[in-house]
């Protein structure tokens, strides 16, 4: 896979079984091209999960559904990708940004497949 995320701010961390972003607002990712959407991701042994809290600008939800909905948002859940049979994500490299778009993060996994975010902020896997 190659996965592309856009970060509003903060640091990113990767390990074999987890993906975490530390931002000024909390743990999460904000899609900068859709300012009214936020996204939070967590990993477990089953799959890599994505949550998006809509309609609550600028807020990150470490625990997605309940707090998001309590504050007037709605949460969309997506499974981004499954781990390999040994339970690891086989991350090969992480590349941060370029001169034109320095908030872009490219995550290359060893199986070579591609994951991207399309113009509507949905996740599309090639």
Annotated model-derived regions:
Residues 1-126:
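CBM-like, beta-strand-rich accessory domains located in the C-terminal region of large
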